[in-house]
Amino acid sequence: NMHTIYGAMQAGVDIVAMGAGIPADIPKYMRDMAEQKPIDFPISVANATQDYFLKFDPERYKTDTDLRVPRFLMIITSHILAQRFKKHVVPPDGFIIEEPIAGGHNAPPRTPGNKAVALDETGQPIYTARDHANMDTMRSLDVPYWLAGGYGSKEGLARAKALGARGVQIGSIFALAEESGMAEHLKQRVISEIRDGKGIDVYTDPLASPTGFPFKVARLEGTMSEPDVYEERDRICDLGYLREAAEVTFVGRDGKEKKTVVYRCASEPIDDYLRKGGKIEQTIGRKCI
């Protein structure tokens, strides 16, 4: 979102890290915004019959303060992407490489010939050596990188540095911090089970996220991680963080077909989603996360 990035630049942030999709052109957009140049930012719209853009003009929000361009770290999963985007018009300043066990969303396993993703006996995606970045290749690129996914400890940091990384990205541990948005009673239950040595069963759910990407789910009794609880919950999309834009056709008052763009979410009420052109199979197992 250009408005969010521009606001962050006005606040003087030092670093922007991003990985949703492939944000290859963000460094260029930040440079253009610092120079007060207007931007046509392409928007991904499902079922689009034309190209869509968000027009952003920094002059509209200009302040007296000169803006500097933050450093940009691109979150990726593969050394192949690092090789590719190091040569980009305005390359990133570094990379964050996420392993398949990283929390939150994960890239799906790479499958030859676009075959369907294989699942293990528990229903989790099967990751192989193809899904891990080659550290020898990363070292050879002479670009700083950080590692993520199972590195959130003193030992993990040492392991990452031994692999040539500048440091690590940690996220899951902060979900248990005082400032996190997790419900306090759930947070305390997780902390308690970790302290007691029981640990938490974390499951890579291929269906939970409305985006369709695998998503890490902590299995806790009484939460939507349990199928029975999920089935009893009302479907809802009240925040819209993971909505997608979609082009739909409707009949206007004049009786003519028209096209418009709507926002939809595969975790919203099914009838609403279908009315916006969504497919029923995309709603199976989807949760508001």
Residue spans for each PLM region:
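Active-site entrance/lid segments in N-terminal catalytic domains of soluble metabolic enzymes
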Residues: N1-S140, E155
